Amino acid sequence: DLYLIAVSDRAVGEVAARLPIPDGAAVAHTAGSVPLAALPERFARRGVFYPMQTFTRGREVDFGEIPVFIEASSPALCDELEAFARRLSRTVIRSDSAQRAKVHLAAVFACNFANRMYALGERIARDAGLDFGVLKPLVTETAAKARDARSPLDVQTGPAVRGDRAVAERHEAMLDGDPRAREIYR
């Protein structure tokens, strides 16, 4: 048997400590930022099964496209987790807790920080009397280019890349009333 603990990162240890899981069962959590050691040692077969994706209730994802990072307390359990993961995903990566913590940080930058920038763009567009919809084709193309490029840096555009200081200064002036947005822009 495999028991997956799919709760918020901060709840993994507490939930695991309270679960009535039979001896000999495998227990794995799905949290990217939580080390394997967060699972109590009373579970002889401990593991991590981290699908690196953002999940939203009611929104379908293609699990085959989602990289799954695995780690286990033994090579045998790692093999079991890998076999399970390969039934769901085309990309399975064996990863220790330190590497997984870094990939989780990278995921936060790539997903959450980018989304925060979309929200800032939405606010600026609304200040100009426009809906976020006007930015959606740009968001889609930017994400597609970043996905398809060797590196996102290869497809960076804008006044900074072009060395167009005059445009950058005008943009910064428009952000005078919002020091935080101005700092992000720089």
Where does each model-flagged region fall?
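Rossmann-like NAD(P)(H) cofactor-binding subdomain of soluble oxidoreductases
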Residues: 1-60
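Charge-dense polyanion-binding interfaces
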Residues: 30, 83, 183-186
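Short, glycine- and charge-enriched coil/turn segments that flank and shape catalytic ligand pockets
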Residues: 21-24, 129, 176-179
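A general structural signal for well-ordered alpha-helical segments in protein cores
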Residues: 12, 36, 78-81, 106, ...
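Internal alpha-helical scaffold of NAD(P)-dependent oxidoreductase catalytic cores
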Residues: 60-148
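Glycine- and other small-residue-rich loops at beta-strand/loop junctions that grip anionic moieties
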Residues: 4-5, 70, 159
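Interdomain hinge/lid region at the active-site interface
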Residues: 142-186
